[in-house]
Amino acid sequence: MKNKFIFFTLNLLLAVLGAVLFALSHPNYLNLNGFPFFAYIALIPFFLLLKRTKLKFSFLWGAFSGALSYFIFNFWIIFFHPLAIYIIIAKYCILYSVLFFVLKIIDSYFSRYSFIFQTIAWVAFEYLNTLGFLGYSYGIMGYTQWNFPILIRVSSIFGVWGISFLLVFFSACSASFLFEFYKEKDIKNVYQRYKLPMMIWVGTFFAFILYGAFTKIDLSEAQRARIALVQPNRDPWLGNLEVYRNNYEELKNLSEKALKNFPDIELVVWPETAFIPMIRWHYKYTSTYNPNSLLVRELLHFLDNQKVPFLIGNDDGVLDEKFSDNNFDNLEDKRLDYNAALLFIPKKNVSPPEPQTYRKMHLVPFTEHFPYQKLFPRFYEFLKENDTHFWEKGKEANLLEFNNFKIGTPICFEDTFGYISKAFSKKGANIIINLTNDAWANSAVSQYQHLSMAVFRAVENRLPVLRATSSGQTAFIDQNGNIQEMLPPFIKDILVADVTVLTEGHKTVYSYLGDFFGVLCTIVLILNLCFIIINKFIKRSEVK
């Protein structure tokens, strides 16, 4: 009984240690930059735990490890929505229980060199975790290295998945080495078996470093675009006409200050849903004397009298095409709402408002979008009653153009996914501008975790990435993955960035092939599992 308790306690300690190291590897409450070197060893406790546990218990340890890891790592999400933390915990209970079960099957079947296939499985699960309605990119191991541009430039080939593979392989191989050494107590013999894979890992690590060094883009002769990013630091939980007017006045004053101090600014950017109310809807469908309409017309008058374009985040309301413009009965029920980026060019598309438009395509699950209303009507109503704002999904990665520049504008959550910025790049974008509002969490940790993923969007496509945020992290990241300028969090200020632009573009392997490495790992994992299952059936039939 005592031995069982000690055995269980040690397993529990391994699960807790793995969860803590996982969370500390990313931006966290102790260090906003994270402890990136922990990422190389963070998963060792999990892989050791899998070596020690039986297949039938791997589900439970996976559920516990996943829930604890993301509870610590994503603790700030409690402030986003009362349901969010429960959804995250439930998701990673299920995901990690399946992941640990698969990893244990691989460990049992391939034995000594299971760490190779376990690495492939882990990266495959990371990739699959980003897909579909529940897609969520936070927690991918590769993102821990965001502050090492020379290493992560290889993402222009493999995406973030190549960096994840490097980190997970080290943990899996080290755990296997430690476990065998513990069993055999013969360091020389064990070392001989693991010398080759570790030499290959070291060679790969330095190959990535060399690739990063030799592919650094010389930006000294690049064209420059001076762009002002406004960070208003407003409270997103406050919402009435007086608040909207005060927010507008703050945005206007900050913009005028920037334009006065830097008259050669070419574009001013306001963050996600920076201006409320809906510009097009209130201009077209509400009375001229309606307070919302008056505020909209005041904004349009201001924009039309500027000398530069303005890129503005707005809740874009449009009439459903199924209904006629001439029928004004129950208009609110006929409106489709989009989270949008609107580009206004003075004297061209401001009055009446016909801005160039991009509408957010990848919405936050449950709080911005729930596509299963007919299947789960009660749950849908429950979500609506709990402070959710549902938007329609945009359909195209439209580029917004001014002067000689073509900009892609992923909105908030969207820059955590590589495929959206890739779509902009493929269409010919030469600047990526992300509009974000992370102020709802009131957490610098949340904002730095988000920033860590944005850095990869720059190196994947070798495009400059600008982030205009409500409260942080407003920043300019160059094509080499260097954060050139960044405002402190939770202040009202303007970042005026001299953005290096390669007007002819700089297409990468990732720009063409996207997440092929994640797909490849998934295919190999499926083939491995099929091979194991078929082999089991063959052995059973031979026994009979």
Swiss-Prot record:
Keywords: Acyltransferase, Cell inner membrane, Cell membrane, Membrane, Transferase, Transmembrane, Transmembrane helix
Active-site residues annotated for this sequence: 272, 360, 412
GO BP term (any one): lipoprotein biosynthetic process
CDD domains with a match to the protein in the record: ALP_N-acyl_transferase
Pfam families attached to this UniProt entry: CN_hydrolase (PF00795), LNT_N (PF20154)
Residues annotated as transmembrane: 30-50, 57-79, 91-111, 115-135, 157-177, 197-217, 514-534
EC number, UniProt record: 2.3.1.269
Residues in CN hydrolase domain copies: 225-501
Function: Catalyzes the phospholipid dependent N-acylation of the N-terminal cysteine of apolipoprotein, the last step in lipoprotein maturation.
Protein name listed in UniProt: Apolipoprotein N-acyltransferase 1
Origin species: Treponema denticola (strain ATCC 35405 / DSM 14222 / CIP 103919 / JCM 8153 / KCTC 15104)
Gene expressing this chain: lnt1
